[in-house]
């Protein structure tokens, strides 16, 4: 009997230690406060040009947070997700699909959602109304004979990473809803880096079509002033939630609040607004929650079925 009591007592001690360890782990999992903040962007245009544009953001964040800040541009959508998952990056400017993936795989948390000016079709002229969504477009060269989604069968299309909402997921899902399967209808996809390259691939005749975000043609107006006449939209998708500012899942709530305030203050400043506007056409940031991205999850499921 004494032996049984000793065994039970030992088990209770072990159980207590396990419980304490688990409790401390949970606390540690939400208690990370960076001493040197790492911020990363995904490339929406030429990576070198974009890197030069975002570098000044580091100083503005340092002034707000009073810690060293490093700002970089990732090579693609997947690398930033993996970098946040492996805790090499603290803050990511994640497009909606990349956020959904990062949240599912690594518990990444969304803090803010971007606001942009809306666009009027057909020439993508910006309105004065701020919105928290955007749309994807499928564009072709004018006079190509491609007038609708069915005409894309057998054609060559410039696309972005498969985690890109406007550069892949939403256009592919919408094509599927209209009976065009990107894997089975003899369509050739060409992955390019940045929406400026996607637009120019159509403009120069290197591809028949491109998946872009609405307004992306404006990125190349300086080099191709007649782009609106030569590259036209044949399809515009439903609304896509705007880009996020997201953080690694173990970041402390207190530091999350500091970041929210810092980014909102920067967006309101002259220098800060110039940076975010030139990089992603962001005009400001509003608080966001995970359920805001359920539409993205719906379209992700459609694309996943296509790939099965």
Regions found by a protein language model. Give the residues of each.
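Sec-dependent N-terminal signal peptides of Gram-positive bacterial secreted proteins and lipoproteins
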Residues: 3-26
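Extracytoplasmic small-molecule ligand-binding "clamshell" domains
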Residues: 28-100
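An extracytoplasmic/periplasmic, membrane-proximal ligand-sensing/linker region
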Residues: 31-56, 246-308
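Bilobed "Venus flytrap"/periplasmic-binding protein-like clamshell domains
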Residues: 40-63, 74, 115, 127-199
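Short beta-strand-to-loop elements that line the ligand-binding cleft
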Residues: 68-75, 90-93, 184-194, 232-235
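Acidic, polar ligand-binding/catalytic clefts
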Residues: 82-151
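A ligand-binding cleft/hinge motif common to bilobed small-molecule-binding domains
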Residues: 96-107, 176-177, 201-203, 208-228
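Short beta-strand->loop
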Residues: 108-131, 185-188, 221-239
């Amino acid at each position: 009997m004494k032996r049984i009591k000793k065994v039970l007592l030992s088990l209770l001690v072990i159980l207590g230690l396990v419980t304490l360890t688990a409790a401390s782990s949970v606390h540690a999992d939400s208690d990370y406060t960076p001493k040197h903040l790492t911020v990363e962007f995904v490339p929406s245009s030429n990576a070198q040009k974009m890197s030069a544009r975002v570098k000044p953001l580091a100083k503005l964040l340092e002034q707000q947070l009073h810690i060293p800040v490093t700002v970089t541009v990732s090579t693609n959508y997947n690398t930033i997700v993996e970098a946040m998952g492996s805790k090499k990056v603290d803050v990511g400017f994640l497009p909606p699909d990349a956020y959904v993936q990062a949240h599912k795989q690594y518990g990444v948390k969304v803090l803010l959602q971007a606001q942009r000016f809306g666009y009027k079709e057909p020439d993508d002229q910006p309105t004065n109304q701020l919105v928290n969504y955007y749309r994807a477009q499928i564009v072709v060269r004018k006079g190509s004979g491609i007038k609708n989604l069915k005409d894309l069968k057998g054609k060559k299309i410039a696309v972005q990473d498969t985690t890109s909402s406007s550069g892949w997921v939403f256009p592919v899902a919408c094509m599927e809803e209209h009976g065009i399967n990107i894997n089975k209808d003899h369509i050739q996809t060409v992955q390019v880096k940045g929406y400026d390259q996607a637009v120019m691939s159509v403009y120069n005749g290197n591809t028949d079509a491109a998946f872009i975000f609405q307004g992306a043609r404006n990125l190349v107006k300086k080099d191709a002033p007649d782009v609106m006449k030569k590259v036209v939209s044949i399809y515009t998708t439903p609304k896509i939630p705007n880009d996020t500012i997201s953080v690694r899942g173990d970041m402390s709530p207190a530091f999350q609040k500091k970041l929210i305030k810092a980014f909102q203050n920067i967006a309101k400043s002259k220098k800060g607004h110039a940076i975010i506007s030139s990089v992603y056409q962001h005009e400001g940031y509003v608080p966001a929650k995970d359920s805001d991205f359920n539409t993205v999850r719906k379209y992700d499921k459609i694309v996943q079925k296509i790939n099965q």
